[in-house]
Amino acid sequence: CIDTIQDDVLQDAARRFVPRIHEYPHMMRGTGYLCSLINHDANIIAKGGANGVYGIGLKKERIGISFKIKDGTEAVWPLIIREIFRQIGYYNADTDKMLVSLNNGVTVNDNDTPVGEVKTVFTLEKHF
């Protein structure tokens, strides 16, 4: 939440640059990546980091979310984000469709035959 930044210079920079993220989301990482695609949702500021770390801010809800995938993989990020959004009651049809397009949970072999699935099996705990 920009209004909680106590440093005036940093707060001013955030006010100027956050809208640019939504205007040019591909600059976050490049085309076709979660970090770029999710920032099309004007209510979200999100960025992945090293070793499977991901951070998300929901502006209107004033919620910050972060998680880390122990083995560092990024492939499951869309599944995890979608489940987090489901559990907290956040829904944007375009964002949901994009998350499913990146990973729908179905594992396929080289012949595109489904051979398994990945499911999220966690329940969020509130810490505030």
Protein language model features and the residues they cover:
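Structured C-terminal helix/loop/strand segments within mature extracytoplasmic catalytic/sensor domains
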Residues: 3-128
